[in-house]
């Protein structure tokens, strides 16, 4: 290490982990399947920085992937395992902006990637408070994108889904399945029987398009034209 520059961050999307230099060693951050939501009822009042029981079995596939990619990682041993909570929202985006129903109360939280968006979020929030509106369209992170449909069971299912999707490919306009269908109109079943392929907006199921004869009633996400193009 002596005389060498600091190692850059490594990311392996297939094995779903990142690795970077930390205090003279390497830190491995895996994003595993099946990570359970915690603090659904909120943390205790005296909770500050609580760590949970180590669970190396759950991390084994990611550790094996890291050793395959960086063989030296398998030779140095594990000094410490941190298993703690990380803040997530149902869609994985932070929550920045004015709170529902409260005057002069602003929210800036849900930053699951740490300080990455700190500068931009602080900048836009300051403009919002001082000037009355932000320079950038903040609709994607607005607290008001969630309504009273976002119950605790909904939040649990969607937060677990958002965490498990961090390292997979994200397609344009994809509609994720957890906690759905949640709110449906009286004609939902009729539209479904007519071939509707549904999306979700503000908790409501609504048709994105209707599958034609012989077409599977399911979207196939793509960076090009998916099957909705032929139907429409």
Features from the language model and the residues they span:
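Short, glycine-/Ser/Thr-/acidic-enriched flexible segments
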Residues: 24, 33-34, 101, 112-114, ...
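Internal hydrophobic alpha-helix adjacent to the cofactor/substrate pocket in enzyme cavities
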Residues: 117-139
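Generic secondary-structure signature for well-ordered alpha-helical cores
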Residues: 68-75, 127-134, 146, 196
């Amino acid at each position: 290490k002596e005389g060498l520059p600091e190692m850059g961050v490594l990311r392996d999307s297939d094995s779903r982990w990142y690795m970077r230099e930390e205090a003279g060693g390497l830190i491995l951050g895996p994003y595993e399947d099946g990570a359970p939501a915690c603090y659904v009822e909120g943390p205790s009042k005296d909770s500050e920085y609580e760590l949970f029981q180590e669970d190396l079995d759950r991390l084994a596939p990611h550790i094996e992937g890291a050793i395959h990619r960086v063989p030296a990682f398998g030779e140095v041993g594990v000094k410490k395992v941190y298993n703690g909570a990380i803040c997530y929202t149902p869609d994985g985006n932070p929550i920045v902006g004015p709170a529902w129903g409260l005057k002069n109360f602003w929210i800036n939280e849900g930053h699951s990637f740490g300080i990455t968006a700190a500068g931009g979020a602080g900048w836009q929030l300051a403009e919002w408070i001082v000037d009355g509106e932000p320079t950038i369209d903040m609709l994607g992170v607005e607290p008001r994108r969630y309504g009273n449909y976002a119950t605790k069971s909904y939040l649990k299912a969607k937060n677990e889904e958002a965490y498990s999707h961090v390292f997979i490919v994200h397609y344009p306009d994809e509609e994720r399945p957890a906690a759905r269908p949640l709110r449906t109109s009286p004609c939902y079943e009729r539209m479904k029987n007519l071939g509707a392929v549904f999306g979700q907006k503000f908790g409501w199921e609504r048709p994105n398009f209707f599958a034609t004869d012989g077409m599977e009633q399911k979207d196939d996400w793509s960076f090009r034209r998916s099957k909705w193009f032929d139907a429409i």
